[in-house]
Amino acid sequence: MTANQTPQTVHYATVTWDQLHRDARLLAATLMQKHGPFRGIVAITRGGLIPAAILGREMGCRLIESVSVISYAGEEGTQHEPKVVKPPVAAGDGEGFLIVDDLVDSGVTARIVRELLPKAVFACLYAKPEGKPFTDHYVTEVAQDTWVLFPWDTAPLFVPPLVRSEGE
């Protein structure tokens, strides 16, 4: 960082299991109302796996396929040229299928999956402004500078009380 640069502030949003479940059920209700039944679901790995399982249960959809696109390296989230490492073979061109992800961020992964499955419906729980054009449905918009922490990314941690008793 040079003298003229200021540190970039990163904001965090923590999604709990309860919130994730509520949002997934809300998304399922919207999808059932607007699209009726789907032949199958394509989960974008890894973040779309758990939302896809919840949506599959709520919508009575048992055929769940996956697609794996690698575009980030490491937990620091360094973006690289995206590469499909596992295509969604069972989904054909996507007709009758629902693509599911936890979050659409920059839209890089979503764009690639949409190219693979042009006839599919794309839905995610959370969308950032840059990624919104790539999804048909989402539950909550998140600011572009926010890092979303999902339940599978975090662990419960004991935090000691602020006040200790005198006997300790």
UniProtKB/Swiss-Prot annotation:
Q: Per its UniProt record, what PROSITE patterns does this chain match?
A: PUR_PYR_PR_TRANSFER
Q: What class of enzyme is it?
A: transferase
| Entry binding sites for GMP | D105, S106, G107, V108, T109, W147, V148
- What are the GO cellular component annotations? cytosol; plasma membrane
Record SUPFAM superfamilies? PRTase-like
- The UniProt record lists the EC number as 2.4.2.-, 2.4.2.22
* Entry binding sites for Mg(2+): D102
What topology in the membrane does the UniProt record assign? Peripheral membrane protein
- Which residues are recorded as binding guanine? D105
Q: Which residues bind 5-phospho-alpha-D-ribose 1-diphosphate?
A: R46, G47, D101, D102, L103, V104, D105, S106, G107, V108, T109
Q: What pathway does the annotation place this protein in?
A: Purine metabolism; GMP biosynthesis via salvage pathway; GMP from guanine: step 1/1; Purine metabolism; XMP biosynthesis via salvage pathway; XMP from xanthine: step 1/1
Which coenzymes or cofactors are required?
Mg(2+)
Q: Does the keyword Membrane apply?
A: yes
Q: Where does xanthine bind?
A: D105, V148
Q: Which GO terms describe its biological process?
A: GMP salvage; IMP salvage; purine ribonucleoside salvage; XMP salvage
User: Its catalytic activity?
Assistant: GMP + diphosphate = guanine + 5-phospho-alpha-D-ribose 1-diphosphate; XMP + diphosphate = xanthine + 5-phospho-alpha-D-ribose 1-diphosphate; IMP + diphosphate = hypoxanthine + 5-phospho-alpha-D-ribose 1-diphosphate
Record key words, sorted: Cell inner membrane, Cell membrane, Glycosyltransferase, Magnesium, Membrane, Metal-binding, Purine salvage, Transferase
Gene3D superfamilies, per this entry?
Answer: 3.40.50.2020
Record function comment: Purine salvage pathway enzyme that catalyzes the transfer of the ribosyl-5-phosphate group from 5-phospho-alpha-D-ribose 1-diphosphate (PRPP) to the N9 position of the 6-oxopurines guanine and xanthine to form the corresponding ribonucleotides GMP (guanosine 5'-monophosphate) and XMP (xanthosine 5'-monophosphate), with the release of PPi. To a lesser extent, also acts on hypoxanthine.
What family is this?
Belongs to the purine/pyrimidine phosphoribosyltransferase family. XGPT subfamily.
What does the record note on quaternary structure?
Answer: Homotetramer.
- HAMAP family assigned to the protein according to its UniProt record, in alphabetical order: XGPRT (MF_01903)
**What's the protein here called?**
Xanthine-guanine phosphoribosyltransferase
* Native source species: Gluconobacter oxydans (strain 621H)
